[in-house]
Amino acid sequence: MTLTASSSSRAVTNSPVVVALDYHNRDDALAFVDKIDPRDCRLKVGKEMFTLFGPQFVRELQQRGFDIFLDLKFHDIPNTAAHAVAAAADLGVWMVNVHASGGARMMTAAREALVPFGKDAPLLIAVTVLTSMEASDLVDLGMTLSPADYAERLAALTQKCGLDGVVCSAQEAVRFKQVFGQEFKLVTPGIRPQGSEAGDQRRIMTPEQALSAGVDYMVIGRPVTQSVDPAQTLKAINASLQRSA
């Protein structure tokens, strides 16, 4: 399926599903994308694919009607991070992220860089604690807080800086919705339908559980991209979410 769209006229989806594209080969990625419908999900492009294929690959996905989460986790001095976020907005992506551990000045600069884009600005999300990290990993970094407590501290800083939300584990979602309110968006990786392997994610949850926990956007990768019928898999996930709503 190929749809023609621009940043202002993409296919609209109400689905909270964001499919993580993790391909080494551009043609394989596009072959997968052409099997699914932009009404059923958004797409996430991360560091590897963006480094391999660049902004033009994002444009090709947008031309097929998909909203794009550009998952590059910017973490730099404030001026550099701000310019990077503005470049993502120029590309017309739907969502872009930074590391909350970059600090308040960096996050504020990133937010201010999006002001000129007005209603066309992408959602600006901060990464708290990577879902692969456990308490022992934080101890190695000199942190005595649990992953949940550290993530909440970073989320509070993110909200104070005026960003749209955070990337967090599904286990933190219930608490975060209570503390930060319904408008503060929660984006959660490590979401896997029942029966899927955990892979390299440590803190995982099913789509239905994530929805109940208050997750706004759930990132799902291999259970969809490696499915023999990804379009049907997406429809089944969305149907289960509608039943759970």
Swiss-Prot record:
Can the keyword Transcription regulation be found in this entry's annotation?
Answer: no
Gene Ontology CC annotations of this record: cytoplasm; cytosol
Keyword annotations: Decarboxylase, Lyase, Pyrimidine biosynthesis
Output the Pfam families linked to this UniProt entry.
Answer: OMPdecase (PF00215)
According to its UniProt entry, one GO biological process term is: 'de novo' pyrimidine nucleobase biosynthetic process
Give the matching InterPro entries: Aldolase_TIM, OMPdecase, OMPdecase_AS, OMPdecase_bac, OMPdeCOase_dom, RibuloseP-bd_barrel
- Cross-referenced SUPFAM superfamilies, in alphabetical order? Ribulose-phoshate binding barrel (SSF51366)
Q: How does this chain assemble? A: Homodimer.
The identity of this protein, by name, is: Orotidine 5'-phosphate decarboxylase
Q: Which organism is it from?
A: Escherichia coli (strain K12)
For this protein's source organism, the top of the classification is:
Bacteria, Pseudomonadati, Pseudomonadota, Gammaproteobacteria, Enterobacterales
